Amino acid sequence: MSASEATNIEVVRKYIDGCNSGDLTDLLSTLAPDVIHYFLPSQFPPIRGADHLARYWRKYKAVLDPVWSIDRIIAQGDEVVSEWSCNWTPKATKARLMLRGSEWYVMRDARIAEVRAYFTYADNGNAELAGFPYGERGYLTL
């Protein structure tokens, strides 16, 4: 792994730490000013701009108390891909649920310039791959 790839992975890890804490300074230190975060069409429109995205994650933390864990992460050049687990609390049930997904990051000058998020919510149950042995493979579990 090259030094720039290792740096890019550390930036993504710091971004996830910022999502976990809701700390605007940490989040902004990882984002390009013109970052775009894309979601699946059934979820949200793209979020554009570092300030907007950082404030989004701060609010998300305050409302749903998510805790992300990066399960796998790889880098190639200026792109990083992570597979993650997130336990969170939907407003309707107040019960902790597990959400799993992947994100593709495009980096620019050791900052996140683009995020493509692949996951779906299930407010009434866990959003996981059916039958996948998460615990046996060392993934975060509830």
Predicted regions located by residue number:
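A beta-strand edge to alpha-helix "cap/lid" segment located at domain peripheries
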Residues: 2-7, 20, 55-142
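Short N-terminal signal/transit or membrane-insertion segments
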Residues: 12, 36-47, 135, 140-142
